[in-house]
């Protein structure tokens, strides 16, 4: 429920992409938000308003339902006072060009003109219309005025042509809306670099040594950082399929590749002190020799001894000067887990360690996690959905490192 008590006003115009708006409402409500919908007359030609009312659990505002009865407060002025944000999705080229010119000849456009909150526009139009110089000029004008105009995507359009103009997927619009609603001054314009997933160390060209780390915790943490406004780079081997598209993703399979990409990512610095989250499960040992091609079992015989050598300690070898460094440690021995994490905190000169004790409930690949956050002189416990506890952990860091 990351959007608990947030009020989202969704304005829907007449586009074939309207079906995506229904999924978008579902995502917002699942995240705990309150959603109200404004429909243009064109939108109602595609989908009956009752469908939006059933999913949003709120009465639709349109030309026929607008009321100036003060007991209802359901008009284009009052509804903008209720909203925390206004999202127009889909937004046709006609609507975009009218907004740019300040035209308010229907209820939806009047609402836009009356709104003093952040406005996000998700365009949807034929390639020729979205790339028309008039539309391009309108988009640029709206951006200069402070509107957030999202990009479109290239895919098969309603006319069966493949081209630019399709509205972003609902999950991408959801991510962008979450960022606008959740970003904080502490995290905004702050660098955050993360590693994630289990490394894959090649034996030959078809076999490798790895572990069960799914990469989900790193991706959840990267997403939470993005929502809070950070400039995020995720260096990961797996589990990043649903992260926001604006996150800088650097796919890295081997520990050496991960090390090199982390070094490069940490070179980019802002005025605020950066954060490094070492979430990846890096192989402690790697094959001493990497074989070309595929080793044949006929030549290997009944037994096969594979020689391993100790791997580089990425966290110990990265330059962590002027960087908040957070280590992640997975343990199975409950008795020794905390002392092992405390040793990691001290020996690697870290600012914090997130301890994850693995058991039947808290296992690799699950969507929930139980973490003990260890600082130099205190500790905190977190349990729940990985995205939710990521936001809680980051909120704790903001409180603990508030002056830096």
Name these PLM-found stretches:
Residues 1-120, 126-404:
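A cross-family phosphate/adenosyl-ligand binding-site feature
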């Amino acid at each position: 429920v990351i959007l608990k008590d947030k009020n989202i006003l969704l304005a829907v115009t007449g586009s074939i992409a309207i079906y995506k708006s229904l999924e978008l409402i579902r995502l917002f409500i699942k995240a705990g938000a309150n959603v109200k919908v404004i429909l243009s007359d064109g939108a109602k030609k595609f989908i009956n308003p009752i469908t939006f009312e059933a999913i949003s659990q709120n009465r639709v505002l349109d030309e026929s339902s607008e009321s100036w009865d003060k007991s209802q407060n359901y008009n284009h002025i009052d509804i903008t006072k209720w909203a925390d944000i206004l999202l127009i999705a889909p937004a046709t080229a006609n609507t975009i060009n009218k907004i740019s010119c300040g035209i308010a000849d229907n209820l939806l456009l009047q609402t836009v003109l009356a709104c003093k909150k952040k406005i996000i526009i998700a365009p949807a139009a034929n390639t020729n219309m979205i790339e028309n110089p008039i539309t391009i000029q309108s988009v640029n004008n709206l951006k200069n005025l402070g509107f957030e105009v999202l990009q479109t995507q290239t895919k098969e359009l309603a006319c069966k042509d493949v081209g630019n103009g399709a509205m972003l997927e609902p999950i991408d619009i959801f991510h962008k809306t979450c960022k606008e609603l959740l970003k904080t001054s502490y995290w905004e314009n702050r660098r955050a670099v993360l590693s994630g997933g289990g490394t894959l160390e090649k034996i030959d060209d078809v076999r490798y040594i790895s572990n069960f780390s799914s990469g989900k915790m790193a991706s959840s943490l990267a997403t939470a950082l993005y929502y809070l406004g950070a400039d995020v780079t995720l260096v990961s081997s797996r589990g990043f399929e649903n992260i926001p598209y604006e996150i800088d993703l650097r796919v890295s399979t081997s520990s050496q590749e991960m090390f090199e990409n982390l070094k490069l990512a940490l070179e980019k610095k802002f005025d605020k002190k950066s954060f490094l989250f070492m979430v990846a499960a890096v192989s402690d040992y790697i094959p001493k020799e990497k074989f070309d091609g595929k080793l044949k079992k006929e030549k290997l015989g009944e037994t096969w001894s594979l020689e391993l050598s100790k791997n580089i300690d990425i966290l110990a070898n990265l330059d962590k000067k002027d960087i908040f460094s957070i280590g992640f440690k997975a343990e199975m021995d409950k008795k020794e887990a905390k002392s092992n994490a405390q040793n990691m905190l001290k020996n690697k000169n870290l600012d914090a360690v997130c301890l994850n004790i693995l058991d039947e409930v808290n296992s690799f690949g699950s969507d929930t996690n139980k973490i003990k956050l260890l600082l130099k002189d205190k500790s905190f416990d977190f349990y729940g959905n990985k995205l939710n506890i990521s936001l809680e952990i980051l909120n704790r860091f903001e409180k603990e490192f508030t002056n830096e």
